[in-house]
């Protein structure tokens, strides 16, 4: 069975790489994007590779939507045509491709867990309307052009868990896990407007590293994990010149988070996370010094999950979360510039307070394998977004 699933994994991921999200996974989204100290979710292959170290063989697939700012047209007064740049909810590109598909293979044993993970992740989909600025004192900006860029990443990772104290022994610093992922990044870029209609694609390499520490565990009603993960930037060697047409690299990011397991049997989980995303180094410096460039984002999240026992084999997981989401601009009325192009879009704010929600249901088969389906949504941003996921042990 394992060899069959391995073959399926490699074939699926190969197809994905050929065909080509910020917080990936329905469970992650429902809990405010708070995920760095997860140790039981196969999406950790991407989120924090150390988190898969003790996981069993399993598969995870997730679809989700993204916020885009496409250029549209509406009829204005008389026979005029007005441009619109309103936010909208869109599927990934292509729509049939999952935002995440990944596999975990446990190749160690209970005494010395060692896991291998493979995945394809699409964490970002950019769709911005822009205006080419030729005068530093230009007062009005019109969405003359549109840039669309999809970022995907194929990863293979390994994670090892090291016991510090024996299982069942209450105390601090019970175990530590370390994980490393090697990545091939893929981007597809399209620019339209100003007499241009250009599409290109490119690949680059990157990596991700992560650690997970069991801070405390009484094996009864209280447990704390600390997770740290870093994902490198992927730089692309475009055939177009970013000084002439706007294009972005895939940003590096750093995540630090805690997970708390509470109450008898630990049915309650609370997660806290901080995330830094280096958007400032992914774009060109503004052509004119009186315009702002893209800035880094710092996001803060808290999530809640509670396990409700429906039957001996079925559990229900209601989830809630809050996320302080930082857009890569400092002023919604003075949007950033990359090279000679300034963003032109309708946005509500610079920092958004997102309310997230979701539910999961899991069941155990007669063979003892766990299956789960998860749904999530969020509100409070420029557009609402949703995610759905499937996880299954094999």
Report the location of each language-model feature.
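N-terminal, post-signal peptide beta-strand-biased segments of exported outer-membrane/organellar beta-barrel
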Residues: 16-122, 346-350, 355
């Amino acid at each position: 069975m394992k060899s069959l699933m391995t073959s399926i994994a490699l074939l699926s991921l190969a197809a994905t790489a050929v065909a080509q999200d910020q917080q990936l996974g329905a469970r992650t989204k429902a809990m405010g994007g708070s995920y760095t100290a997860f140790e039981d979710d196969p999406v950790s292959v991407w989120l924090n590779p150390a988190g898969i170290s003790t996981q069993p063989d399993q598969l995870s697939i997730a679809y989700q939507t993204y916020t885009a700012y496409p250029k549209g047209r509406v009829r204005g007064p008389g026979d005029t045509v007005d441009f619109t740049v309103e936010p909208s909810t869109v599927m990934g590109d292509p729509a049939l491709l999952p935002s995440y598909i990944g596999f975990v293979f446990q190749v160690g044993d209970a005494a010395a867990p060692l896991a291998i993970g493979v995945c394809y992740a699409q964490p970002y989909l950019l769709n911005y309307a822009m205006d080419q600025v030729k005068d530093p004192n230009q007062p009005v900006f019109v969405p003359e052009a549109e840039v669309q860029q999809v970022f995907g990443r194929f990863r293979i990772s390994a994670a090892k868990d090291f016991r510090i104290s024996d299982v069942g022994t209450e105390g601090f610093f019970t175990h530590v896990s370390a994980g490393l992922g090697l990545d091939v990044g893929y981007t597809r870029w399209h620019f339209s407007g100003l007499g241009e209609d250009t599409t290109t694609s490119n690949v680059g390499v990157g990596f991700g590293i992560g650690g997970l520490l069991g801070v405390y565990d009484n094996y009864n009603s209280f447990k704390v994990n600390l997770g740290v993960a870093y994902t490198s930037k992927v730089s692309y060697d475009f055939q177009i010149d970013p000084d002439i047409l706007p294009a972005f690299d895939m940003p590096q990011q750093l995540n630090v988070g805690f997970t708390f397991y509470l109450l008898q049997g630990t049915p309650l989980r609370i997660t806290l996370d901080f995330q830094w995303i280096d958007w400032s180094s992914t774009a060109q410096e503004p052509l004119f010094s009186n315009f702002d460039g893209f800035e880094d984002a710092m996001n803060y999240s808290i999530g809640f999950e509670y396990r409700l026992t429906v039957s001996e084999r079925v559990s229900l997981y209601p989830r809630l979360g809050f996320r302080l989401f930082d857009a890569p601009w400092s002023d919604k009325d003075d949007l950033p510039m990359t090279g000679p192009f300034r963003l032109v879009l309708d946005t509500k704010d610079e920092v958004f307070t997102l309310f997230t929600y979701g539910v999961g249901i899991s069941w155990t088969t007669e063979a003892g394998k766990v299956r789960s389906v998860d749904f999530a949504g969020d509100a409070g941003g420029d557009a609402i977004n949703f995610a759905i996921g499937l996880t299954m042990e094999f």
